[in-house]
């Protein structure tokens, strides 16, 4: 039987507009948000920074947690984020950087 993984996440803009969502593939979903592939609030307010997330193996628990977060006032959401991520760093900042080949030392040119 395949094990399912679900994530409830909060993403923020530079001005700290906050979007809350739920997905079964957080890496794919963050790629979509970061590249403005998701129409709506997150695209309009440029919410590209993953500032908080929780993982679940049960979809109902994930949906319930997302709904709970959405009912919370802003102060409570900020407190939760800042407890674990006080500077609102992008937790997915390095997920999509391309790897470049960087040799440790230069190879000498071939003699002509």
Q: How does the language model describe each region?
A:
Residues 68-80:
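Short arginine-rich
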Residues 1-38, 43-49, 53, 63-67, ...:
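GIY-YIG nuclease catalytic motif and its immediate N-terminal context
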